[in-house]
């Protein structure tokens, strides 16, 4: 949450601490949460940040027919194929794609360090922000990865 808060504040926005909605990482609960947000803020909000792509897609689809949410940014995390396709077709604004290969590789590398009694620090596997500008390239990568 701290990262969201810092980002919103740095952009000059107002982070609504009391509006954090927990959806247990499920699309169904994200729909309910988004309906509640639209009810409480009928004028719209600037951004909806979700902790995974499924929740972001559910929120965006719930709000799609509400004209006051037409300019709302919907951000997901994971960079899964369905979300990248949704970014490309304009249904989702962006997703923060994780590098699954590096996550696995770095996890094994860190485990080996632990087993060998070696020091290890924070592990950053990187993130790529997927927008309409680079969504097709990411989809092309999926095709290559799945050969």
Regions found by a protein language model. Name each.
Residues 48, 74, 88, 102, ...:
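Short glycine/serine/threonine-biased micro-segments
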Residues 17-20, 74, 95, 129:
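Conserved beta-strand scaffold positions in the cores of enzyme catalytic domains, especially
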Residues 6-11, 99-147:
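Hinge/cleft segment of the Venus flytrap/periplasmic-binding protein
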Residues 4, 19, 23-85:
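Hydrophobic alpha-helical
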